UniProtKB/Swiss-Prot annotation:
GO terms for biological process: reductive pentose-phosphate cycle. This is Ribulose bisphosphate carboxylase large chain. Keywords: Calvin cycle, Carbon dioxide fixation, Chloroplast, Lyase, Magnesium, Metal-binding, Monooxygenase, Oxidoreductase, Photorespiration, Photosynthesis, Plastid. Its cofactor is Mg(2+). The record marks K337 as: Transition state stabilizer. It is an enzyme of class 4 (lyase). The modification N6-carboxylysine is found at K205. It comes from Porphyra purpurea (Red seaweed). Heterohexadecamer of 8 large chains and 8 small chains. RuBisCO catalyzes two reactions: the carboxylation of D-ribulose 1,5-bisphosphate, the primary event in carbon dioxide fixation, as well as the oxidative fragmentation of the pentose substrate in the photorespiration process. Both reactions occur simultaneously and in competition at the same active site. The active site is at K179 (proton acceptor), H297 (proton acceptor). InterPro entries: RuBisCO, RuBisCo_large_chain_AS, RuBisCO_lsu_C, RuBisCO_lsu_C_sf, RuBisCO_lsu_fd_N, RuBisCO_lsu_N_sf, RuBisCO_lsuI. PROSITE patterns: RUBISCO_LARGE. Its EC number is 4.1.1.39.
Length: 488
C-alpha cells in the first residue's frame, strides 16, 4: 500500500524541521507504492558515488526528475506534493556488476503535457544526468500508459499502408544509401539513384549529412533524384522511391523542402534525429497531413546510447520516436559494421513493430507495454551489410525491415545496377527457400551459391565480400544472459 495519512503527516512535519534532508525521507522513496495504470514508469541504471546509498540515489533521481530541489521549499505546501512527487519504488542490483543498480521510478501522468516528447524528456532526462550523487546514470527503459499514448499521433503512415503503397509484400524492403555521401553533383547523384532502382532496389536514400551544400543545392538534388526515380519506375514497372533529406537549419526551411519534395512527386522524405524532438514531431504531423512516408536517420544517437553505464538505451529512443510519429528508423543490423547485439536489436525491433510487448529481460524489455494501437514503425538495417549475409539478415530481422546496402550496392565491381541486382536476387532466393520450408539459415551459403549460377552480379558480390565481417563484441549487451552475445 501507499504511505498512510499518519506517515505522510510525520514526513511533512520532519521535512520542515531542517533545510536539507535526504530525498528518501522527503517522500521520493516508497517501497510500498502501488503502481497505477496511468503512471509513466522509468528504469534507470545508477552507479552511486562511493558512500551513497542506492536507495537514496534512486530517490534523488526521482526527486530531481519531478518536483524536488536541493533544499526544502515552503511552496510545496501550496501543491499536491504527495501526488506530484515521483516515487522510486524498487532497487535491484545489476547482475554480475559491482556498484550498479536498477532503479524503478513511477511518475504521475499529470506531471507531463499531453502529446509532447519535449516536455517528457525535459523531466526524465533533463537535469538528473549531471547530478553529483551518482557517478553514472543511464535510462534503460520506460512504460507509457495507454492514456498517455493516446495523446500522440504515432507513425504518419505505418508499415501496413507503406506496403500497400509500395506494392511490396512477403519480403523485406530493399534499399541503398547514395555513396559517396558528399561531393557528387546533382546530375551524377540522380544517376546513382536511377542505376540502383533500375537494378532492383525499392528505395535509394540520401545520407544523414547531405542537405544543401555548395557542391549540390537541395533543389538540384531533389529534381535529379526524382528524375531517376521516375525513369527507373517506368523501366521496371514497379513503384520505387528515394528518401529526400529535408533536414535544415530552421523549421521554415524544412517545411519548404518537404513541400517541394511532395510537389516533385516523392512518396517519402527524410529527417535526422539531430533536429530535435519538437522538430521531429512537427515533421511527422506534416507527413500525415500530406500523405508522405517519413524516414528518420538516427544520426547522433550513439553519443549517448552506446555506453552501457551512462546515457540512454536506444530502445527508449525507439519508443519516443514511435510516439513522435516517424515511419522508419535505423535500428541496427546485428551483422554489420555498427554496434548491434542480437538480443538488444531484437528488443528494438519488437518495440517498433509489436502491438504489445511483455517483459523480456534478455532483450532489455523491463516493462510490459501496450501500444494503444499506434501504427508500426519500420526498422531500417544499414551499415556494412552485403549479399553474402542475406540468410543471417532474414533470420535475425525478419520481413518487416528495410535492408539498406550502400557500399554493398554501389561498391560492386560491375557497377551500381549489378550491385542492386545481386542484392535483389540474393533476397528473393532466400525468401523462396524459406517459403519452401528449407532451413535457409543452415543452407544459406549454398542457396546463395546456387542462385549465383544464373546471376553473374551475385557471384561477383559473393567472391568480393565473402571474407568480410565485423566480429566485435558489442558494448551494450544483455544483462540477463550468462555470456554476452557479440556480432557474428
Amino acid at each position: 500500500m501507499s504511505q498512510s495519512v499518519e506517515s505522510r503527516t510525520r514526513i511533512k512535519s520532519e521535512r520542515y524541521e531542517s533545510g536539507v534532508i535526504p530525498y528518501a525521507k522527503m517522500g521520493y522513496w516508497d517501497a510500498d507504492y502501488v503502481i497505477k495504470e496511468t503512471d509513466i514508469l522509468a528504469l534507470f541504471r545508477i552507479t552511486p558515488q562511493p558512500g551513497v546509498d542506492p536507495i537514496e540515489a534512486s530517490a534523488a533521481i526521482a526527486g530531481e526528475s519531478s518536483t524536488a530541489t536541493w533544499t526544502v521549499v515552503w511552496t510545496d505546501l501550496l501543491t499536491a506534493c504527495d501526488l506530484y512527487r515521483a516515487k522510486a519504488y524498487r532497487v535491484d542490483p545489476v547482475p554480475n556488476v559491482a556498484d550498479q543498480y536498477f532503479a524503478y521510478i513511477a511518475y504521475d501522468i499529470d506531471l507531463f503535457e499531453e502529446g509532447s516528447i519535449a516536455n517528457l524528456t525535459a523531466s526524465i532526462i533533463g537535469n538528473v544526468f549531471g547530478f553529483k550523487a551518482v557517478k553514472a546514470l543511464r535510462l534503460e527503459d520506460m512504460r507509457m500508459p495507454v492514456a498517455y499514448l493516446k495523446t500522440f499521433q504515432g507513425p504518419a503512415t505505418g508499415l501496413i499502408v507503406e506496403r500497400e503503397r509500395m506494392d511490396k509484400f512477403g519480403r523485406p524492403f530493399l534499399g541503398a544509401t547514395v555513396k559517396p555521401k558528399l561531393g557528387l553533383s546533382g546530375k551524377n547523384y540522380g544517376r546513382v539513384v536511377y542505376e540502383g532502382l533500375k537494378g532492383g532496389l525499392d528505395f535509394l536514400k540520401d545520407d544523414e549529412n547531405i542537405n544543401s551544400q555548395p557542391f549540390m543545392r537541395w533543389r538540384e538534388r531533389f529534381l535529379y533524384s526524382m528524375e531517376g526515380v521516375n525513369k527507373a519506375s517506368a523501366a521496371a514497372g514497379e513503384i520505387k522511391g528515394h528518401y529526400l533529406n529535408v533536414t535544415a537549419a530552421t523549421m521554415e526551411d524544412m517545411y519548404e523542402r518537404a513541400e517541394f519534395s511532395k510537389v516533385v512527386g516523392s512518396i517519402i522524405c527524410m529527417i535526422d534525429l539531430v533536429i530535435g524532438y519538437t522538430a521531429i514531431q512537427s515533421m511527422a504531423i506534416w507527413a500525415r497531413k500530406n500523405d508522405m512516408i517519413l524516414h528518420l536517420h538516427r544520426a547522433g544517437n550513439s553519443t549517448y546510447s552506446r555506453q552501457k553505464n551512462h546515457g540512454m538505451n536506444f530502445r527508449v529512443i525507439c519508443k519516443w520516436m514511435r510516439m513522435a510519429g516517424v515511419d522508419h528508423i535505423h535500428a541496427g543490423t546485428v551483422v554489420g559494421k555498427l554496434e548491434g547485439d542480437p538480443l538488444m536489436i531484437k528488443g528494438f525491433y519488437n518495440t517498433l513493430l509489436a502491438g504489445e510487448t511483455e517483459i523480456n529481460l534478455p532483450q532489455g524489455l523491463f516493462f510490459a507495454q501496450n501500444w494503444a494501437s499506434l501504427r508500426k514503425v519500420v526498422p531500417v538495417a544499414s551499415g556494412g551489410i552485403h549479399a553474402g549475409q542475406m540468410h543471417q539478415l532474414l533470420d535475425y530481422l525478419g520481413d518487416d525491415v528495410v535492408l539498406q546496402f550502400g557500399g554493398g550496392t554501389i561498391g560492386h565491381p560491375d557497377g551500381i545496377q549489378a550491385g542492386a541486382t545481386a542484392n535483389r536476387v540474393a533476397l528473393e532466393s532466400m525468401v523462396m527457400a524459406r517459403n519452401e520450408g528449407r532451413d535457409f539459415v543452415a543452407e544459406g551459403p549454398q542457396i546463395l551459391r546456387d542462385a549465383a549460377k544464373t546471376c553473374g552480379p551475385l557471384q561477383t558480390a559473393l567472391d568480393l565480400w565473402k571474407d568480410i565481417s565485423f566480429n566485435y563484441t558489442s558494448t551494450d549487451t544483455a544483462d540477463f544472459v550468462e555470456t554476452p552475445t557479440a556480432n557474428v
